[in-house]
Amino acid sequence: RRVLIRDSKLVGADLSLSSLQHVTLASCEARYLNLSQSRIRDMSFTGCRLDECAISQTALKGVIFDQCQLNRADFFETPLKGIDLSSCEIAGIQLSGKELVGCTVSPLQAIALAQLLGLLVKEDW
C-alpha cells in the first residue's frame, strides 16, 4: 500500500479532491500540481519542485516537506499545524496567516512571513 514516485514529471497534474495515503514523492518536478480540497495523510515530499502548486483547503496529517521548492505555493485555508517547512524555499507563499499556527519555519522564513503578513520588520534593535 505504499507508493514511491521518484524522478517523475507531474507538472500541472490535477489531483484535487483526492485522498492520498502513504505516498512519497522524491526528486519530482511538480510545478503547478493541484492538491486542493484533498485529504493527505502520511505523505512525504523530498527534494521536489512544487513551485506555484495549489494545496488550498486541504487536510494534511503526517505530511513531510523536506528540501522542497514551494515558491508561490497556495496554502490558503490549509492548516499547517505540525508541518515543518524550515528546509524548504517558500518565497511568495500564499496564505492568510491563520494557516501558520503551529507550523515550523526557519528564522529567515519567519522574517519573510512577517513581512508577507504586513508586519514591518525593523532590522536594528
Sequence positions of predicted segments:
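Tandem repeat scaffolds
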Residues: 1-125
